């Protein structure tokens, strides 16, 4: 029988490939060869069939993931395996007798772990500190050995194609195989085959290529004292072996004592040794011998291993290439708990588990080894593009080559160097790779390789093909060179470095130019800033005085000695035409103007005349317009200001005398145009704001003194949009953050300040202090915060004073939603909620609280809703917010909504009034903040991940539009995972206007559904995710009490609604009693009988045992845990959806207002 690769050739590289690769790859790739099975399949006996264990979540695990260091269970990602009882009349099939079903919940992790190293040793280390306990060095052979028999042949023998291959084994589960081959396409390749699979396919002998494979497999089992590491028993396929270790005497001074000390626990540890011999079929000469040994757990415990998807205490150990191991505790946001170094890299990690309930405490407890599951070290780790392609290769002291891939061992290549074989040519022409000494091979190959490349680039001489016009035979040789070689001086053509530099001369020149430009900007930044300030000052002065007045003004012309001031801070008027004469002195702020002097008596310049013209703004402006009517004559008093109306409706004015009718009609039209274009803006001509007075600001040693505000311009805290810079400052001795903005963005600053003044009376909204203007800038003083939420989540180590007591994630999210709820109560929609705009501050001293304060900040894009308005219009071209954090309704126009006339309201399917923009046919509500908060919540709970990063960060908005999010990382939260998933899923609802379908109308009810409406801030604050354990347990007991009084024969609609969620809560088995421990069920049945398929009985059992908790035996209470948290966890671990299912039933039945449940659905003020 021949195995061939498609399209094989008789060239040397093809021969090499035919020699080795087809044997390994063909069984997996070529399905047409049916005479040799590609895998060995053993049918399960009736007692070995598996079925689902409902409470544990399904997690997809790659088959070749070894773990953080070790591998996943051999049983794969299936759930708990329970042995089905065999028939009484027949014997059990398989290797093991019938076993009772075991649950991982009945086991606890020991305080030490076992680490297997490449040199073949087993080390017991402390789980929390990494301190050494004991080491097992039997046998002493390394895990990987590779013997190449080229060294046994004469140097005069002809080189064989197989001499150019190196076999490399990854000491993970079953031993993944790699090969390295030199040549033009040199590189590391993964065969997709393991040593175990190769052994199972032997014996095999072929003629094309003429290669024979034979193999053997030997197993040894050790029983070890878990406390001392002494080997108690040895079982081997080669026969009985004496352990060589005596037992520990009870009396250490009595050497003749016969009684031995009973070990507190025993470990069963297996070692499987594989050996594969590769020989030439024709000559019988040996080619290579591969030996691989791996440490394994007892296969009897595969039922527990198949349930072990995450460690019990969130502790993981990661291995580095140089023997260093890092111990992490993922439940805490800090750096590695400990670091230890071994003489050889650690390749397997086993957690040790002990049963909680021990029948005989005096006997030695059999402990179980569980291969530690894979856990990424960081949420962003899985997004690295080339993570799975990076492999570290090295060899043992005996010359055995081994590999450690980043896919199997996260962080292993972090500090390793790239292999030198891709940079230098270590082989002379025709020299086999295996003929080199081991030291030279290691110098060339040891290091990081990439499965996607790089490949060695050889400067192989070649003959260029003819050009469209065939070259004549007398074409000079120099003209046949490449352009880069032709331009290079002949003396430098053989220098690789110079030739590469010459080929990339343009890139190098541009890089150097940019570096010089960057250095120039850096060293002259202060001078550039000063020039920019001076230019702005000159621009303001010229704009105020140098522009000639137009013959026909576009806004009213006001003639008065002074103007009535508004209570709001004064604003600068840009692009104004001002003609000023000095009026008679009067006190600033006087509400009553003094009598004007007769113009003839005083002179033509005695009365100030101010002509104001402000450029129109776009239709998105929502500021009020204060109309200033022109005085008919100097003797007439100024008319009272009148506010404009939204929507651009014109005021109807009373008629004037005929002599003024024409001019007044023209003025009315001008005012109406201003109202339409610029609603809610104020025209407050203040002559002091037109010019910037140089002595308003005092600058000394990087400190600016502006009134009561001091700005430290050399301490920059951050940068924002519109040229905004945030400095450290002080206001009346209080440390503040000073936000500096250009005067051109005065409207934005005034808008932000107005909202801050209105909303800063809340613990979770940033506080506003003052505002100053000087030198062409506006300065806003705000509360100073040491970090933002993004800083706290992504770099907690930089803020030890904030995280010293740990982070209470639910409290952080509760404060954020409380601040947003307060803004929404004031009809303020933030529109730019993201981690950067949520600041973190220390608790205030007078409150006595130790929890951090979360503050909503950056109100530059906020919208204020008018009375009876619950939404506003936005366009996709001017959608507010930050990319990746915006709601889908801001990104997609609603084409299904009919066009509405501008300035009118409409009723949507949710019966909410909306303000319609005539330029678009779409609205947006407070729900856009809820969507952004859903992304922020996920970001906080997963420590930096984004729910829409499924295909990378650049696809966020595309995924948002499609509603394509992924919440799998929430499973790490444990008890709160289900509630967090439900809350965030509803907040990320694609369409906020959808309404929930009737809960009990469908038998196939799914708790996770996209029909949930996006909740408001109050509903988010009342979600069960924010309930404490006491409230959660009380709620479940109240649900049980309420439904006890429902009619049962026939059952009421409410009771049917409750029972409709039983399948979701209990799983397909529909029997909650099967998931409870035997001792608990025995104690439960003493009071009354329960039907396992009834939700009512499940809630009754939970309530009754809570009420009779003190009547339970001590050992049962220790197993369950204390009230309320331990007892609640006992139930929610087995029934994760119980709380949310009952919550949904109460909401659907509209029972939230009755006295029993009212307190759960009332937000705390």
From Swiss-Prot:
Keywords: ATP-binding, Glycoprotein, Hydrolase, Kinase, Magnesium, Membrane, Metal-binding, Multifunctional enzyme, Nucleotide-binding, Serine/threonine-protein kinase, Signal, Transferase, Transmembrane, Transmembrane helix, Unfolded protein response, Virulence. GO terms for biological process: endoplasmic reticulum unfolded protein response; fungal-type cell wall organization; intrinsic apoptotic signaling pathway in response to endoplasmic reticulum stress; IRE1-mediated unfolded protein response; mRNA processing. Residues 637-655 have a biased composition (Basic residues). It comes from the Eukaryota. Residues 526-1165 are cytoplasmic. Pfam families: Pkinase (PF00069), Ribonuc_2-5A (PF06479). Its main location: membrane. The active site is at residue 832. Disruption phenotype: Leads to avirulence in a mouse model of invasive aspergillosis. Results in severe defects in the expression of multiple virulence-related traits, including reduced thermotolerance, decreased nutritional versatility, impaired growth under hypoxia, altered cell wall and membrane composition, and increased susceptibility to azole antifungals. Residues 711-1026 form the Protein kinase domain. Its EC number is 2.7.11.1, 3.1.26.-. Autophosphorylated mainly on serine residues. GO terms for molecular function: ATP binding; metal ion binding; protein serine kinase activity; protein serine/threonine kinase activity; RNA endonuclease activity; unfolded protein binding. It is a single-pass type I membrane protein. Residues 591-600, 611-620, 656-668 have a biased composition (Basic and acidic residues). Homodimer; in response to the accumulation of unfolded proteins. Belongs to the protein kinase superfamily. Ser/Thr protein kinase family. This is Serine/threonine-protein kinase/endoribonuclease ireA. The lineage of its organism: Eukaryota, Fungi, Dikarya, Ascomycota, Pezizomycotina. The gene is ireA.
């Amino acid at each position: 029988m021949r195995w061939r690769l498609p399209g094989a050739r008789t060239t040397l590289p093809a021969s090499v490939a035919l020699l080795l690769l087809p044997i390994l790859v063909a069984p997996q790739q070529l399905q047409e060869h049916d005479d040799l099975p590609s895998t060995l399949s053993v049918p399960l006996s009736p007692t070995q069939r598996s079925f689902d264990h409902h409470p544990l979540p399904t997690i997809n695990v790659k088959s070749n993931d070894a773990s953080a260091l070790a591998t996943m269970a051999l049983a794969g990602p299936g759930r708990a395996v329970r042995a089905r009882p065999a028939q009484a009349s027949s014997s059990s099939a398989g290797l093991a007798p019938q076993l009772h079903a075991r649950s991982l919940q009945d086991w606890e992790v020991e305080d030490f772990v076992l680490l297997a190293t490449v040199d073949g040793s087993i080390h017991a280390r402390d789980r929390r500190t990494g301190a050494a306990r004991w080491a097992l060095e039997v046998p002493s052979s390394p895990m990987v050995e590779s013997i190449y028999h080229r060294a046994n042949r004469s140097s005069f023998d002809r080189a064989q194609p197989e001499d150019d291959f190196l076999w490399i084994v990854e000491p993970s589960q079953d031993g993944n195989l790699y090969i390295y081959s030199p040549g033009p396409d040199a590189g590391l390749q993964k065969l997709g085959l393991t040593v175990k699979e190769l052994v199972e396919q032997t014996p095999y002998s072929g003629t094309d290529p003429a290669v024979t494979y034979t193999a053997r497999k030997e197993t040894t089992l050790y029983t070890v004292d878990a406390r001392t590491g002494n080997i108690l028993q040895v079982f081997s396929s080669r026969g009985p072996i004496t352990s060589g270790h005596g037992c520990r005497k009870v009396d250490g001074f009595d050497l003749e004592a016969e009684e031995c000390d009973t070990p507190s626990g025993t470990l069963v540890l297996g070692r499987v040794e594989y050996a594969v011999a590769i020989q030439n079929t024709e000559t019988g000469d040996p080619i290579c011998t591969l030996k691989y040994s791996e440490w394994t757990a007892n296969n009897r415990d595969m039922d527990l291993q198949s349930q072990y998807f995450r460690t019990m205490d969130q502790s993981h150990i990661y291995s580095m290439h140089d023997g260093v191991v890092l111990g992490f505790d993922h439940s805490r946001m800090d750096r590695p708990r400990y670091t230890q170094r071994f003489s050889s890299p650690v390749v397997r990690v086993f957690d040790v588990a002990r049963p909680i309930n021990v029948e005989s405490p005096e006997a030695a407890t059999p402990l179980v080894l569980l291969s530690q599951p894979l856990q990424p070290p960081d949420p962003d780790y899985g997004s690295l593009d080339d993570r799975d392609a990076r492999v570290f290769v090295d060899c043992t002291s005996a010359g055995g080559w081994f590999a450690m891939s980043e896919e199997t061992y996260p962080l292993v290549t972090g500090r390793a160097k790239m292999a030198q074989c891709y940079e230098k040519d270590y082989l002379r022409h025709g020299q086999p790779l295996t003929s080199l000494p081991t030291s030279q091979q290691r110098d060339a190959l040891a290091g990081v390789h990439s499965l996607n490349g790089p490949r060695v680039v050889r400067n192989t001489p070649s003959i260029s093909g003819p050009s469209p016009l065939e070259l004549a035979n007398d074409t000079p040789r120099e003209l046949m060179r490449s352009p880069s070689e032709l331009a290079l001086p002949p003396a430098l053509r053989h220098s690789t470095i110079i030739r590469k530099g010459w080929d990339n001369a343009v890139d190098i020149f541009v890089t150097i130019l940019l570096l010089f430009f960057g250095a120039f900007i850096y060293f002259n930044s202060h001078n550039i800033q000063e020039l920019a300030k001076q230019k702005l000052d000159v621009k303001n002065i010229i704009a105020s005085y140098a522009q000639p007045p137009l013959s026909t003004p576009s806004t009213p012309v006001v003639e008065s000695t002074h103007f009535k001031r508004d209570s709001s801070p004064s604003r600068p008027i840009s692009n104004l035409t001002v003609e000023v004469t000095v009026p008679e002195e009067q006190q600033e702020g006087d509400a009553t103007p003094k009598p004007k002097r007769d113009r003839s008596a005083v002179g033509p310049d005695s009365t100030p005349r101010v002509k104001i013209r402000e450029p129109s703004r776009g239709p998105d402006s929502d500021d009020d317009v204060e109309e200033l009517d022109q005085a008919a004559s100097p003797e007439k008093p100024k008319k009272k200001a009148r506010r404009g109306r939204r929507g651009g409706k014109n005021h109807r004015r009373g008629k004037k005398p005929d002599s003024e009718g024409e001019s007044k009609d023209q003025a009315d039209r001008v005012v109406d145009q201003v109202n339409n274009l610029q609603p809610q803006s104020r025209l407050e001509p203040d002559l002091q704001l037109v010019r910037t007075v140089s002595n308003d600001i005092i600058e000394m040693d990087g400190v600016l003194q502006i009134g009561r505000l001091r700005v430290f311009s050399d301490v920059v805290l951050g940068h924002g949009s519109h040229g905004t810079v945030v400095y450290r400052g002080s206001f009346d001795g209080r440390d503040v953050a000073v936000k500096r903005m250009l005067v051109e963005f005065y409207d934005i600053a005034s808008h932000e300040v107005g909202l801050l003044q209105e909303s800063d009376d809340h613990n979770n909204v940033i506080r506003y202090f003052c505002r100053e203007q000087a030198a062409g800038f506006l300065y806003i003083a705000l509360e100073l915060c040491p970090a933002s939420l993004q800083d706290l989540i992504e770099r907690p180590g930089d803020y030890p004073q904030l995280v010293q007591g740990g982070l209470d994630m639910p409290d952080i999210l509760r404060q954020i939603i409380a601040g947003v709820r307060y803004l929404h109560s004031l009809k303020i929609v933030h529109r730019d909620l993201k981690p950067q705009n949520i600041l973190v501050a220390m608790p205030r001293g007078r409150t006595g609280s130790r929890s951090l304060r979360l503050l909503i900040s950056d109100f530059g894009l906020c919208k204020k809703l008018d009375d009876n308005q619950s939404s506003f219009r936005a366009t996709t071209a001017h959608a507010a917010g930050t990319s990746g954090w915006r709601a889908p309704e801001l990104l997609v126009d609603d084409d299904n909504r009919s066009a509405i006339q501008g300035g009118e309201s409409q009723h949507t399917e949710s019966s909410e009034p909306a303000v319609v923009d005539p330029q678009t046919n779409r609205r947006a509500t407070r729900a856009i903040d809820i969507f952004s908060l859903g992304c922020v919540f996920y970001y906080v709970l997963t420590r930096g991940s984004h729910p829409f990063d499924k295909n990378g960060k650049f696809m966020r908005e595309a995924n948002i539009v499609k509603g394509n999010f992924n919440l799998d990382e929430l499973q790490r939260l444990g008890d709160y995972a289900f509630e967090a998933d439900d809350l965030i899923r509803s907040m990320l609802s694609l369409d906020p206007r959808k309404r929930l379908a009737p809960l009990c109308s469908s038998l196939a009810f799914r708790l996770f559904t996209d029909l949930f409406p996006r909740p408001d801030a109050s509903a988010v604050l009342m979600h069960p995710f924010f309930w404490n354990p006491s409230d959660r347990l009380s709620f479940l007991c109240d649900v049980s009490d309420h439904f006890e009084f429902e009619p049962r024969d026939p059952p009421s609609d409410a009771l049917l609604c409750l029972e409709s969620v039983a399948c979701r809560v209990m799983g397909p088995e529909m029997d909650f009693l099967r998931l409870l421990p035997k001792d608990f069920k025995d104690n439960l049945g003493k009071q009354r009988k329960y039907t396992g398929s009834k939700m009512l009985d499940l809630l009754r059992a939970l309530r009754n045992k809570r009420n009779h908790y003190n009547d339970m035996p001590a050992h049962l209470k220790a197993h369950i845990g204390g009230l309320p948290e331990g007892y609640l966890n006992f139930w929610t671990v087995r029934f994760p959806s119980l709380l949310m299912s009952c919550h949904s039933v109460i909401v659907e039945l509209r029972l939230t207002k009755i006295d029993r449940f009212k307190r759960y659905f009332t937000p705390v003020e």
